[in-house]
Amino acid sequence: MTTTISQRKNRAAGANPLQKFWRKRRGDILPPIFGILGFLLLWQLISSAGLIKLPPPSSLWTDPRTRTLLMYPFYDQGGLDKGLFWQTLASLGRVAQGYSLAAIVGISTGILVGTQPLLDKALDPIFQFLRMVAPLAWVPIALVALQQNQPAAIFVIFITSVWPILINTTEGVKQIPQDYINVRKVLRLSPQKFFFKILIPSALPYIFTGLRIAIGLAWLAIIAAEIVMSGIVGIGFFIWDAYQQNYISEIILAVFYIGAVGLLLDRGIAYLQKLIAPGQ
């Protein structure tokens, strides 16, 4: 009996790290997998029964054009004839530019407004008004003002995603505990030390909340903008072009790409928050 118990312990100690990970995380991994498979199965049954006119998920493989897009995401024939990897990458490039600009402007302006109550009262109605404007409403304004698709698309991303960053940063600065302000006065901290030791750490949870909301809005905005703007490489224009040619399976495939990339972007910001501000 003692030998058997000892052997079991040795086997457990020498278990494959992958097996340990599976035993630890299978409760988190299996439910989403079953949920996704159940959704796809239900969709397949409803489409096959003719209850909806959308093609079933199996059409992503049975349709020759969509199967080619699945198997060759990196193909590039020049112009607009590119695989979905390059279409998605082009959209992500625009998102990176517009979102980065929004983060810089939103955080810096939010800190300024949050530390100046009079400025906050003066500008908050403007911020709240502008953030209610839908991304598509900015597209014609951006095209008229900038005259080019690429700068107009970046502007639409910026103007859509800057508001949650700015407003959440402002709120985070305003929520700094009064005790911290008193400590600053007692210790006579310099503005630089107050900024890095008190203000930024206190406001970080609010800033990252704004950043997570903004990355989703930025991704939605570029899809909407590219659908309206013709003749540019991007996942949004790819969807519109497929719709014009009635390639519904291609639209569904692109929607899967959009959802997957959006999820990865959100998880990326959440992971960045854990690295920079663990435990907050």
Curated annotation (Swiss-Prot):
Subunit (UniProt): The complex is composed of two ATP-binding proteins (CmpC and CmpD), a transmembrane protein (CmpB) and a solute-binding protein (CmpA).
Membrane topology of this protein: Multi-pass membrane protein
The name this protein goes by in its record: Bicarbonate transport system permease protein CmpB
Subcellular location: Cell inner membrane
KW Transport (keyword) present: yes
PROSITE patterns reported in the protein's UniProt record: ABC_TM1
Principal cellular location given in the protein's record: membrane
GO biological process, alphabetically ordered: monoatomic ion transport
Organism: Synechocystis sp. (strain ATCC 27184 / PCC 6803 / Kazusa)
Transmembrane segment boundaries: 32-52, 99-119, 126-146, 153-173, 198-218, 219-239, 251-271
GO cellular component: plasma membrane
Domain annotation ABC transmembrane type-1: ranges: 88-266
